[in-house]
Amino acid sequence: MSDAAGLTTLAEMVRDRAKTRGDAIAFEFEGCTTTFAEFNIKTNRVGNGLKALGVKPHERIAYLGKNSDLYFELLLGAIKANVVMAPVNWRLAAPEVAFIVEDCKAAVLFVGPEFIALVRNILDRLPSVRAVITTERGAPECRDFTAWRDAQSTDDPDVAISPKDIAIQLYTSGTTGKPKGAMLSHANFFNLVQTGSDADKPDWNKWTPDDVSLVVMPVFHIGGSGWGIIGLYHGAKGVIAREFDPTKVLDFFEQAGITKLFMVPAAMQFVVRQPRARSVDFSRLKYMLYGASPIPAALLKECIEVFKCGFVQMYGMTETTGTIVALPPEDHVEGSERMRSAGKALPGVELAILDPDGKPLPPGEVGEIATRSGSNMAGYWNLPEATASTLRKDGWLRTGDAGTIDKDGYLYIHDRIKDMIISGGENIYPAEVESALCDHPDIAEAAVIGVPDDKWGEAVKAIVVMKPGKTASVTDIINFTRERIAGYKTPRSVDFIEALPRNPSGKILRRHLRDPYWAGRDRQVN
């Protein structure tokens, strides 16, 4: 169900699906269902409500909450008013949340019930926020979302929208430690989903009216919001999980008849290792799409045995609106060299391997992975220099990942040129963790690296140099850091060293610290 010829904006998509799939279920969340026709009306109300609050086209709103059907009402309702949604990672510490909300100059902050206390404590640091609306009752100082929405007109907001306008702003961590808002346009999303007719698509990329998609990755990730939008585009039913819980994921398979889903490998491991996983009926499951971090071969083999469906590895990033490379089910052959690859470029996506000067390298040589397609982001919000260093004038986006392309077009990822750590699908930059570590009164300097971890892919390891005559326990350092940054960024282990290795210019030689932990592995990511 993907006939959407002539549509150029996500607002048009919602209207079209209300006409063509009106009585079908768009979303199911914790026992409540919303049809496509109802979704169209609810998003009209949200768009009109934002207009009534004085939110102008191209302004931002923010959402701090877990997955819900209301989030997608907000996202698409804002889009109808040409307002940009900026979902916030709810795992972040209060200062990090405040930075994102104020960085995007959110006019309205929508907040889930679990985070009202956090918002109350940082509200004085959010001068741009004109209203706070809670998605569930229980906060007297906040407006109630349902009451606010239902008081609005059901008429279409009727706001002019261009395909080049920004639809969503997703924050991705920066090498300086400050998150960057990647601006994704309507055109970016349509380039992602409109990859030719169904006749030209591989089976794993085809959708039917009977498909049931599970939205289980957090909506502040492209794997959450983007996956939800893809399901809407195809007119499929989307079952929304409030947050990832492996036992509930198994319940969804049994009760909702899930046919497609996207998960990160760490989540797959939690699900497949559940005691009842081997007794669950997965017969309706057609394809499991996975990505955001590589998957250990042993885990993939176990998942294939248990889920008994087609597997598709996805490679992409927030800045490319998600997937640009896919390894299809037919290449998931145990012992095959291609199992080490990330797959081949999707239709309409160009790939290149560049040398340090930005010149293309021949097949088999290692360099920086670059990509060019209509899915490349519009840029980073209010960061022209960062945008220019990532997006070249000729349209090529430099990923910061190192890899090779073989003669058949398969992409092999070797390492990250940037120092980012991926733990359980979450992006973590060493500079941010190092900054928190160096606030410790007894630490002279610190370096942070990612080390192999069977559960999370990579785990954060801190390597610290103590000040002369000072000592601290591993537990003390970890607890100190946890008070300053999100829990998933906190080091899982700490090593002590007399001096950090540096090159003549004084730059820390992070590779020297990492190499002992990655010895004997094909690639320096896990």
Which role does the model predict for each range below?
Residues E350-A370, K407-D408, K470-V474, L509:
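Conserved beta-loop-beta connector loops within the AMP-binding
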Residues L92, A98, L109-V111, F253, ...:
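AMP-binding/adenylate-forming catalytic core of the ANL superfamily
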Residues N48, A52-L53, K80-W148, P468-K470:
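Structural core segment of the AMP-binding/adenylate-forming
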Residues L50-V55, E59, D155-K164, Q169-L214, ...:
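Conserved adenylate-forming
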Residues Y233, Q255-M263, V272-S336, E350:
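Gly/Ser/Thr-rich phosphate-binding loop
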Residues M1-T8, P140-I166:
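Flexible, low-complexity linker/hinge segments
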Residues S2-L7, D23-S68, F72-L76, A93-A98, ...:
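Conserved AMP-binding/adenylate-forming core of the ANL superfamily
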Residues F190-V212, F220-T259, R273-Q274:
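Conserved AMP-binding/adenylation subdomain of ANL enzymes
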